[in-house]
């Protein structure tokens, strides 16, 4: 959802996968334009800073250049527009594995996290794999694709575990790249 969510939730897992030879692609649904209490910064300035921070963190994690969908913070909707954009990215990137938020988690959970998780879930099945969803994408060379697996971050009911201890230093370094969120501003 937000520019620093990957690093907070699964940064060490992503570092492990990258070091194991996986190609890592990151899709960030929101701009991060409201993630501050600093009254001196505009949302546009903050969004630009957070994009740069995400690029720096991606380099640390050995990930490819992040894709920014640019929706404003707190304004994300689980609608056809977002699902179509996520289908496009799934078809373009053709991932074996997708890690996203648990959009079904009860209790406290940021709206953008819930919406991103539910929309990713809906994009993966059935939309990305069905040629009748968004057929115009085929004319762009984007063929249907269904990832082999999806992991949910921020879930209350984990059923899959990865030993991340050896990769925590990389995760922390990637987190620190998000200076606007790690004390570099009145976050």
PLM-predicted stretches and their roles:
Residues 1-94:
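Active-site rim/loop-helix segments in enzyme catalytic domains that contact anionic ligands
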Residues 77-187:
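Metal-dependent de-N-acetylase/amidase catalytic core
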